[in-house]
Amino acid sequence: MKFIRYFHKILTLILFVLILTQCSEKNSREYVKEGLEHLNNEQYDSARKSFLKAIEKDTNNAEGYYGLGGIYNYEKNFEEAERAFKAVLKIDPTHHNAWYSLGFTYELMGKKDEAEESYKKYRRLKGEIDSLINQEKH
């Protein structure tokens, strides 16, 4: 009987510790928010790490990839920036800012045709969004 009580106490303690560690662990969106805060403070290495953690937590977090793409552009790592922005668009093809950023990346890489194609998609999506916003106002 003592063994069962002891076992029950140990099991309760283990479950309590597991619950506490899960509660204190950040989720993907929180890592993106942290990354943006690092960006605002010009802490680019810390921002990159936060965006990578966001993606590690949720491989479908478009904003994590988007932030990472911005960091890679800042670091002039254009191939990685291109991959990051393409990952955003694979998750959300209507992410107009990712189309713009991909176009900008292509421009920096000297790929003018690809840049223009991305900008064209950005303008189309941005126009649709602006139209919806105008409809909401009226």
Language-model region placement:
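Alpha-helical segment of the N-proximal tetratricopeptide repeat
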Residues: 26-57
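Structural signature of tandem alpha-helical TPR/SEL1-like repeats
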Residues: 41-53, 75-87, 109-126
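C-terminal motif of bacterial Sec signal peptides marking the signal peptidase cleavage site
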Residues: 20-22
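Bacterial N-terminal signal peptides that target proteins for export
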Residues: 2-11
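Canonical tetratricopeptide repeat
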Residues: 33, 67, 101, 135-136
